[in-house]
UniProtKB/Swiss-Prot annotation:
Family: Belongs to the enolase family.
Catalyzed reactions: (2R)-2-phosphoglycerate = phosphoenolpyruvate + H2O
Protein name: Enolase
Pathway: Carbohydrate degradation; glycolysis; pyruvate from D-glyceraldehyde 3-phosphate: step 4/5
Residues at which (2R)-2-phosphoglycerate binds: 166, 341, 370-371, 392
GO MF annotation terms: magnesium ion binding; phosphopyruvate hydratase activity
Keywords: Cytoplasm, Glycolysis, Lyase, Magnesium, Metal-binding, Secreted
Principal cellular location given in the protein's record: cytoplasm
InterPro entries from the UniProt entry: Enolase, Enolase-like_C_sf, Enolase-like_N, Enolase_C, Enolase_CS, Enolase_N
Active site, renumbered: 208, 341
CDD domains noted in UniProt: enolase
Length: 429
């Protein structure tokens, strides 16, 4: 009864009103697995290709009818008749048929939606929660609840304001359950709104639900968050730590890091690494993502040498969830953590390869959403099923973000999986 009898895809809308792809995998038993592909705003140049139609007469060129057709024809023909329990074989068939380095033939949005839908169908067929099915794929026996990396203040490509650093986040590390950590994060989020209002600042939110006020500097963004933490009654540096996503590739021009929001200040690689080290010394920052440009491996090496034993240095655009590129980072001792975005690589199997390669080499793993999301909450199950340790899924508003948090609450209720808090981090354990 595990045989795949039909695969269907459709064009749906994501949280930014852009088309994305949703796939159904239907089994002989009647079980249906369904999943959606997310979409990024700031993207690494080596990400797997998200196939868009380019037809300006539909959705301003962002339609995904070609990717949908690839599912309904090529992928349908490839996988119908196969056992849904053979996740690796299903994914490898799509990879081989595509035959390109970046899945440009089928589209990573097409392959990912089908890959995840197959996992949903297999879990349902076995009457298992998805997180348990994912755990079983790689023999993961210990399940943990992830520390949420909550993006409560936005800049850069995620907001229309004057702040250069893309995300200012909080991580509630000093709690004993995910539910308590989530509550603390929500309380700080609401406190931040009141802090911004008192200062006459904009409380509109960006793509990921974080506030996007016009602040004078990156440090001012940190300061208002610290005020919100204090106002809520929590202690920054013990209850709650800060995290940054610089998305530095967005302001790296001609070998210089240029902060336009701060009067076009210009930095060399080492100078910008030193600037970040100064922020870490001054503020309770435990994690920095994409501190330098994805091509600046020399700069990354320097950044790792000065901060790698103190805080988490996360590669997103740097590693693009690609095991081959991650292996280079491991070999060259660049970064100490990887952001996992499954649409950067295009299948569940390759995503798991990246996660377990990182874990085997002492790198921490952060499961992440994209700025263009849907109600699909698969990443919550992925975070628990791989004991990844951390999840990054936006702010404490917008149902496309909150759906993941709510799924984690349900999972915690089911499993009693441990919330490790500070123990997940380099520099805190």
């Amino acid at each position: 009864m595990s045989q795949i009898v039909d695969i269907r895809a459709r064009e749906i809308l994501d949280s930014r009103g852009n088309p994305t792809i949703e796939a159904d995998v239907i089994l002989e038993s009647g079980v249906v697995g369904r999943a959606c592909a997310p979409s990024g705003a700031s993207t690494g140049s080596r990400e797997a290709l998200e196939l868009r139609d380019g037809d300006k007469s539909r959705y301003l060129g962002k339609g995904v009818r070609t990717a949908v057709q690839n599912v309904n024809s090529s992928i349908h023909e490839l996988l119908v008749g196969q056992s849904v329990f053979e996740q690796k074989a299903l994914d490898e068939k799509m990879i081989a048929f595509d035959g390109t380095e970046n899945k440009s033939k089928l589209g990573a949005n097409a392959t990912l939606a089908v890959s995840l839908a197959a996992a949903h169908a297999a879990a349902a067929e076995q009457k298992l929660p998805l997180f348990q099915y994912i755990a079983n794929l790689r023999g993961q026996t210990t399940l943990t609840m992830p520390v949420p990396m909550m993006n409560i203040l936005n800049g850069g490509a995620h907001a229309d304001n004057t702040v250069d650093i893309q995300e200012f986040m909080i991580e509630p590390v000093g709690f004993t359950s995910f539910a308590e950590a989530l509550r603390a994060g929500a309380e700080v989020f609401h406190s931040l709104k009141s802090v911004l209002k008192k200062q006459g600042l904009n409380t509109a939110v960006g793509d990921e639900g974080g506030f996007a006020p016009n602040l004078r500097s990156n440090e001012e963004a940190i300061t208002v968050i610290l005020q919100a933490i204090e106002q809520t009654g929590y202690k920054a540096g013990s209850d709650i730590m800060l995290a940054l996503d610089c998305a530095s590739s967005e302001f790296y021009k001609n070998g210089q890091y240029i902060l336009e929001g701060e009067g076009n200040k210009s930095f060399t690689s080492n100078q910008f690494a030193d600037y970040l080290a100064g922020l870490v010394k001054q503020y309770p920052i435990i994690s920095i993502e994409d501190g330098l440009d994805e091509s600046d491996w020399e700069g990354w090496s320097y950044l790792t040498s000065i901060l790698g034993d103190k805080i988490q240095l996360v590669g997103d655009d740097l590693f693009v969830t690609n095991p081959k590129i991650l292996q280079r980072g491991i070999d060259e001792k660049v970064g100490n953590s990887i952001l996992i975005k499954y649409n950067q690589i295009g299948t569940l199997t390759e995503t798991l390869d990246a996660i377990y390669l990182a874990k085997a080499n002492g790198y921490t793993t952060v499961i992440s959403h994209r700025s263009g999301e849907t109600e699909d909450s698969t990443i919550a199950d992925l975070a628990v099923g791989t004991a990844a340790g951390q999840i990054k899924t936006g702010s404490l508003c917008r149902s496309d973000r909150v759906s993941k948090y709510n799924q984690l609450l349900r999972i915690e209720e089911l499993t009693k999986a441990v919330y490790r808090g500070k123990a997940e981090f380099k520099g805190l354990n």
